[in-house]
Regions:
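Phosphate-bearing ligand-interacting subdomains
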Residues: 69-133
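ATP-dependent carboxylate-amine ligase catalytic core
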Residues: 165-240
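N-terminal beta-loop-helix "entrance" segment that forms/cooperates
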Residues: 59-80, 184-189
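N-terminal amphipathic/basic-hydrophobic helices that include classical n-h-c signal peptides
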Residues: 1-14
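Short internal beta-strands
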Residues: 50-62, 175-177
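Walker A (P-loop) phosphate-binding motif
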Residues: 135-183
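Glycine-rich adenosine-cofactor-binding loop
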Residues: 23-46
């Protein structure tokens, strides 16, 4: 039998010990519609030891108040997973009896990160950062990663230059871009763009076109989307 739920009183606040079911840890994932979905897919989607009760969304406007759809969330989440505004974090931890919060986005200062950690722990939950060994995907083909510490640092022109150099060596090259998931997440699970008409078919935003069109103009192909593993497996068949 499961042990009884323990009820504590901390000052004027009652805290429920939600570990009565040790086989199912309640998780909330903090994100910005990118790494958060990937962390869910590789760490939690098919793991019955955890119950992801929601995502929070930051940085990008109008990406909250919707669902991570059932088709992407997997068999354990037939109703999908709600995406909330990050400003509701404290309330969600308390009302959803969250035991573990996984911080899953970048482009924040150390000070901002630790502020979030303090808020989470004050609400009673653990604060997690998922490391590379548990979340990186093994690739069968060589990968060149173009990274930067901040948005707008110039990754895109560097990526296009690298693609140009590799294509000049006679290699088949595909650019894989972090998604800009403003639309239908299910339709954006795996996206492949090889011509301007593909952008029209996908109803790409101006921001997406600004990113993808220069690759297409130099004869390249671009992959994007929410399910990174499915994207990787398709790219491995298309590129050297």
């Amino acid at each position: 039998d499961a042990p009884p739920v323990a009820l504590f009183t901390t000052g004027e606040r009652k805290v429920v010990d939600n570990r009565a079911k040790p086989h199912e840890i309640r998780v909330l994932i903090m994100g910005a519609a990118g790494r958060d979905f990937h962390n869910f897919n590789v760490l939690f989607r098919d793991n019955p030891d955890y119950r992801v009760v929601g995502f929070t969304a930051a940085q990008i406007p109008n990406i909250d108040d919707r669902l991570y759809p059932p088709a992407l969330a997997g068999a354990l989440y037939p109703s999908g997973i709600p995406i909330h505004a990050e400003q509701d974090l404290d309330r969600l931890i308390r009302t959803q009896h969250v035991e573990r919060v996984v911080f899953s986005y970048s482009d924040v200062s150390h000070e901002a990160l630790m502020h979030q950690a303090s808020l989470v722990m004050a609400a009673g939950a653990d604060f997690w950062l998922a490391g590379p060994q548990s979340t990186m995907l093994p690739a069968k083909k060589p990968v060149v990663s173009i990274c930067a510490t901040r948005t707008g640092a110039g990754k895109s022109p560097v990526a296009r230059r690298v693609v140009s150099i590799l294509k000049g060596e006679g290699l088949r090259v595909a650019a894989v871009r972090h998604p800009m998931p403003y639309g239908n997440l299910e339709r954006q699970a795996v996206q492949r763009f090889a011509a301007l008409e593909d952008l029209d078919a996908a109803s790409c935003t101006i921001e997406e076109r600004e990113e993808y069109e220069p690759h297409l103009a130099q004869g390249g192909m671009v992959y994007a989307g929410v399910d990174y593993e499915r994207i990787l497996r398709e790219v491995e068949d298309q590129a050297d």
